[in-house]
Amino acid sequence: MKITGIIAEYNPFHNGHAYQIAKIKEETDSDYVIVAMSGDFVQRGEPAITDKYERARMALSCGADLVLELPALFACASAEYFARAGVALFTRMGCIDYLCFGAENADLSQLNKIAGILADEPRSYQDALNIYLKEGKNFPAARILALKSYLSAESSDAALQTEQLTSLLSTPNNILGIEYLKALKTCGSQITPYPILREGAGYHDTDILLKNDYAYAILQTLKNDGSSVSSSGSAPDFASFSAAMP
């Protein structure tokens, strides 16, 4: 018996999530999918746009077998603590074989390499990070520069010394995926990470009419009272949600 875990907000649950669950069962041959989901409040302390029971119902109707609530303390925290809490929960359950997550880059070796450095924080990496922070750079920019500095000393990692490193650390799902990998390492978990390449709309794409619509487009449409304009030039009405959400 194989069981895959997913850590998610599902704010809201949409076609991209339904695709992910179906893809997981197809690729891992998993018998069950268990979800650790945020409750009525999500990251940054914002209320979810639909209640936890409705989001759980949608996940179950699209192939998930069990939905557990991630405690609000961690659901509202940063990506690091959000990921750590979900990984700790699945690790203590003792029955999860795979941890699946979406990523803009599904190259596990590259994601693992970065996660390992960020988890171990070698002295030369720490020194470089402190230098860039003292120069006034914000933390994400300083972290990218510190990683480049650290990797430049390792000829075996030349492939990560280009713009690809910036790309890996500038997209939301890659960032969260790296946090999952960090948490697996620090917890000493035996769970196997399994990234799935994101398809359809990018996270920051505001076109709600795309096939696999993602949370950002839906949330932006709600915030703008349905007035955001799609790439086709027409303003979508709320009927388009029927195509974006199960």
For every predicted segment, state its role:
Residues T50-E54, C62, A77, Y81, ...:
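Generic alpha-helix structural propensity
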Residues M1-R55:
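N-terminal catalytic cores of NTP/NDP-binding nucleotidyl/phosphoryl-transfer enzymes
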Residues E69-P246:
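Active-site cores that bind ATP or allylic diphosphates and position pyrophosphate for catalysis
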Residues D31, D65, D97:
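Receiver (REC) domain switch/active-site residues of two-component response regulators
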Residues K25-E26, L60, V87, T91-R92:
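Non-catalytic positions within long, well-ordered alpha-helices that form the structural scaffold/packing
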Residues A8, V42-Q43, A59, L73-F74, ...:
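Short, contiguous strand/loop micro-motifs
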Residues A56-P71:
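A glycine-rich helix N-cap at a beta->alpha junction
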